[in-house]
């Protein structure tokens, strides 16, 4: 699947589940639970213990059923390890030209982060089609996304950071093309079987929430 094809997956499914787990085993269990609920795009933060193994395990178990990426990568070295683990996309917390170029070279979809209008606009000027607004909850939430969309109307935005489940429709209404949800989805007790069943139900609730049309 090409980077362009992967980008279309984001625009089709529009929800990214960003895993939260204390161990690699819990991360894989949580991944199974959210996939059972209907999630089709998973982000594995590089800070999860054994993140590369988690990526490899999910890719092996679910093959083409789910798109798997690594989150918040700060260096080319970590990007290289993730690519060797068969990652499909990478998100960045900020603009990192070296990592962006490395991912492009290896045909991995890269979604860099920006916060201020200036940062987001500079990424758009360099041809990035999807920019991660992070941490969006600290910059005004859905209202801020709406401001960015009015300022830079032709750019697709992925809202991430500090989003709770009930807030998701607000972000779509404000103009976000994609919403990533992490701590707002994964309970602190994730890793225990009852919590896994609850997690699957929470995902179903999430996917049933209304979404404004992609523009």
Where are these regions (language model features)?
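Glycine-rich phosphate-binding active-site loops on the catalytic face of alpha/beta enzymes
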Residues: 89-99, 132-141, 175-196
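Conserved N-terminal beta1-alpha1 strand-loop-helix module at the mouth
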Residues: 1-86, 105, 154, 165-166, ...
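A contiguous pocket-lining binding segment that forms or flanks enzyme active sites
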Residues: 127-132, 144, 153-154
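Residue-level detector of anion-binding/catalytic polar loops
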Residues: 40-41, 88, 109, 129, ...
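Glycine-rich beta-to-alpha transition loops that act as phosphate-gripper elements at the mouths
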Residues: 20-21, 70-76, 92-95, 112-117, ...
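A charged, well-structured terminal subsegment
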Residues: 139, 145-151, 200
């Amino acid at each position: 699947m090409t980077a362009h094809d992967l980008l279309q997956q984001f625009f089709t499914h529009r929800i990214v589940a960003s895993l939260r787990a204390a161990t690699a085993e819990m991360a894989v269990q949580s991944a199974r639970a959210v996939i059972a609920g209907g999630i089709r795009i998973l982000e594995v933060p590089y800070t999860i213990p054994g993140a590369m193994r988690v990526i490899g395990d999910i890719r092996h178990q679910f093959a083409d059923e789910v798109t798997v990426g690594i989150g918040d990568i700060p260096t080319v070295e970590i990007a290289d390890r993730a690519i060797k683990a068969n990652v499909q996309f990478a998100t960045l917390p900020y603009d990192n030209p070296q990592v962006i170029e490395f991912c492009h070279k290896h045909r991995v979809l890269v979604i860099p982060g920006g916060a201020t209008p200036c940062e987001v606009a500079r990424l758009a000027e360099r041809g990035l089609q999807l920019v991660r607004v992070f941490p969006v909850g600290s910059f005004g939430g859905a209202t801020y996304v709406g401001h960015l969309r009015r300022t830079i109307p032709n750019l697709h935005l992925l809202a991430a950071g500090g989003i709770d489940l009930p807030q998701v429709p607000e972000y779509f209404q404000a103009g976000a093309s994609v919403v990533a949800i992490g701590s707002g989805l994964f309970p602190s007790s994730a890793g225990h079987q009852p919590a896994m069943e609850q997690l699957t139900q929470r995902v179903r609730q999430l996917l049933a929430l209304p979404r404004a049309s992609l523009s």
